[in-house]
Design a protein with these regions (language model features):
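Terminal amphipathic alpha-helical/low-complexity segments used for targeting or macromolecular assembly
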Residues: 1-88, 93-94, 147, 153-176, ...
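Structural signal for interior beta-strand "rungs" in well-ordered beta-sheet cores
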Residues: 83-287
Length: 305
């Protein structure tokens, strides 16, 4: 009888230990993503079979029918905010993913990141620590640095605008296979669009600030500490140096290079390279003193008439 009692006590202890262990491992795997499955190569569903029925919901988060169905598609509910994430994503426990936001497979979300409702984080996107992402943001094919602010409605990493006409006169799309790289401490205003690259990555430098409704084409490289005001349009394959300021509605044609410490007046249009630092304006953009003289002469001639 004593032997039987000892065996029963040992079985109860083992069952309690397995329940505690399963709960701990499943909790870590939810947060750690693919690296955890390398150390623990088993399915979440199999964990539930080890736990006692009374503690099943605590030991494994896929115990209910609804959550199990979600897990069949690879998506689960993030406990901090109620958003949805793919089981292969790696998300820091301090990140907040609001209800209605989705983080897709193999993405990495850093510490203290906040993702607003309606935002979609595509496959293999990386978001650095303490970055704030607003509502209805779409990120794909990109990496975002630390301490960035991305306002509502921003789209980053979509196809660039590249087409060609084949021998039959049919318009065909050029492949846009590369990425967008956003530096640290970057702020991007509402409804701005940044296209991914085709032959080189699109790059936004550290501490650059971008206003609302800005279009940045594929293969564009923007340096550090630049300021882009509202409705700026930058065509593909443009290179911009550091500490450049673009006034409202500035337009820059494709394959143009602009040196560091250049400032462009509002409504300017850049049609050729600008190598020297200074202030520029007009269409086409020229040194601002020359542009002002042109405006003065035009005003005088119109008065004489």
């Amino acid at each position: 009888m004593e032997v039987l009692l000892r065996r029963l006590a040992s079985a109860d202890a083992a069952r309690c230990l397995s329940t505690s262990l399963v709960g701990s491992i499943s909790d870590k795997c939810i947060r750690a993503g693919p690296s955890c499955r390398t150390r623990f190569p088993f399915r979440f569903g199999s964990l539930c079979s080890f736990s006692d029925s009374s503690n099943e919901s605590n030991a494994c988060s896929v115990s209910s029918e609804n959550e199990a169905a979600v897990n069949c598609n690879g998506f689960r509910t993030w406990r901090n905010g109620g958003g949805t994430f793919h089981h292969s994503a790696c998300i820091d426990p301090t990140a907040l993913i609001e209800t209605g936001a989705v983080v897709h497979s193999n993405s990495v979300v850093g510490a203290s990141v906040r993702i607003g409702s309606g935002s979609v984080i595509g496959d293999a996107v990386t978001i650095g620590q303490s970055t704030r992402i607003g509502y209805n943001v779409a990120l794909s094919n990109c990496t975002v640095g630390d301490f960035c602010v991305i306002h509502n409605g921003v789209c980053i990493g979509q196809d660039g605008f590249g087409f060609f006409v084949d021998e039959h006169g049919t318009m065909k799309k050029k492949p846009q296979m590369l990425n967008v790289k956003i530096g640290t401490n970057v702020e991007i205003g509402s409804n701005t669009c940044i296209d991914r690259g085709s032959w080189r990555d699109t790059v936004i430098g550290n501490s650059t600030k971008i206003d609302n409704l800005v279009q940045i084409g594929h293969n564009v490289i923007i340096g550090d500490c630049c300021m882009l005001c509202g409705q700026v349009g930058i065509a593909g394959s443009v290179t911009i140096g550091d500490y450049v300021t673009l006034g409202g509605r500035v337009a820059i044609r494709d394959h143009v290079s602009i040196g560091s410490k250049v400032r462009l007046a509002a409504l300017s249009c850049v049609t050729k390279d600008i190598k020297e630092p200074g202030d520029y304006g007009g269409f086409p953009a020229i040194p601002i003193s020359a542009w002002r003289r042109q405006i003065a002469k035009l005003s005088q001639s119109s008065r004489k008439k």
